[in-house]
């Protein structure tokens, strides 16, 4: 006798559930197989502060070729004005033809040299700043990396290490000391933010000078505006010195600051030998050194420097 299997609703539901599970499992496996390679190929996100400096650096590389024709045209117009003024002075003074020819030749040589200097701006000016930066990197050593986001990371680790000591027991036993610890962590974080901001400003300043400074060299052809070019060259040296000193100070300071984190972890942070105040003081001193020393030294070294373009144009009249 043939037996017919009776399919109940419960058995149908069981089979549907098993099939649904198999389908879902297959979908999950397929999704993981597709997603893992995509995640592996996703590039690492650029840190925020390093990204800001990188954007200005890349933009400055585009500014220079766009501004170079404008600087050259401006230079030619002002050079014509300079020769017109010189010719009027030579005529009014009734100089001899030999004197006029000699001065004209010397002035023409100077103007031609300055035009060649503007045309080859990328050959002369960027190596000044880049050379100072390379010297700073070489001085601090290859094992030390100076970057704004790296400084922020050190500050965050230090501040979080301080905050990790503020457990519930400490807050209940000594609320005032817990408040002091939280304030100390805030001061440490602010100090490192200031250091990173100063480094970002110096880097962006150098990029702006290298990218847009060629325009101010266009004023070098006329005695009344040649001071712009003189000041730009001196300012370029000042920016290079500032970047160099920042690399030295921030590089050494970052190495010192990294040693504070294990010191905090290994000590009784709220005891009589607590290093909390010293760590806060060290972070603030680090910030003050970064803000004051590079700018002051760069100003002293390049503040009164001058190539003498305006003086040379006047002397050859």
Regions found by a protein language model. Give the residues of each.
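Hydrophobic alpha-helical transmembrane segments in multi-pass membrane proteins
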Residues: 77, 81, 111, 115, ...
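Binding/recognition "hotspot" determinant
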Residues: 38-81, 88-91, 133
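Juxtamembrane inter-helical linkers in multi-pass membrane proteins
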Residues: 137-139, 211-224, 304-316
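Hydrophobic transmembrane alpha-helix segments characteristic of membrane transport
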Residues: 82-108, 200-227
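Non-cytosolic segments of integral membrane proteins
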Residues: 115-209, 248-309
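Alpha-helical transmembrane segments and their helix-start/interface "positive-inside/aromatic belt" motifs
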Residues: 17-26, 97-116, 131-132, 230-242
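Long, intrinsically disordered, low-complexity regulatory segments adjacent to structured domains
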Residues: 3-5, 9-25, 282-317
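Hydrophobic alpha-helical transmembrane segments
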Residues: 24-31, 74-84
């Amino acid at each position: 006798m043939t037996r017919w299997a009776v399919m109940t609703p419960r058995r149908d539901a069981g089979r549907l559930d098993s099939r649904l599970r198999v389908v879902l499992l297959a979908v999950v496996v397929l999704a993981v197989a597709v997603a893992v390679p995509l995640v592996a190929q996703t590039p690492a996100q650029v840190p925020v502060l390093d990204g800001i400096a990188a954007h200005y650096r890349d933009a400055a590389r585009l500014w220079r070729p766009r501004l170079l024709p404008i600087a050259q045209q401006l230079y030619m117009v002002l050079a014509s004005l300079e020769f017109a003024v010189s010719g009027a002075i030579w005529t009014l003074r009734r100089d001899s033809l030999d004197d006029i020819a000699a001065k004209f030749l010397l002035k023409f040589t100077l103007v031609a040299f300055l035009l060649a200097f503007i045309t080859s701006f990328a050959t002369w000016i960027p190596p000044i700043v880049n050379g100072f930066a390379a010297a700073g990197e070489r001085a601090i050593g290859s094992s030390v990396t100076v970057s704004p986001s790296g400084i922020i990371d050190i500050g965050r680790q230090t501040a979080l290490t301080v905050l990790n000591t503020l457990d519930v027991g400490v807050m209940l036993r000594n609320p005032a000391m817990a408040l002091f610890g939280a304030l100390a962590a805030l001061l440490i974080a602010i100090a490192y933010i200031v250091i990173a901001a100063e480094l970002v400003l110096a880097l962006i300043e150098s990029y702006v000078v290298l990218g847009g400074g060629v325009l101010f060299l266009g004023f070098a052809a006329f005695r009344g505006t040649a001071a712009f070019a003189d000041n730009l060259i001196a300012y370029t040296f000042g920016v290079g010195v500032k970047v160099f000193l920042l690399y030295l100070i921030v590089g050494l300071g970052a190495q010192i600051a990294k040693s504070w984190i294990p010191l905090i972890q290994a000590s009784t942070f709220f005891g009589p030998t607590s290093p909390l105040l010293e760590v806060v003081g060290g972070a603030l001193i680090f910030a003050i050194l970064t803000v004051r020393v590079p700018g002051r030294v760069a100003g002293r070294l390049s503040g009164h420097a001058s190539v003498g373009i305006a003086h040379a144009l006047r002397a050859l009249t």
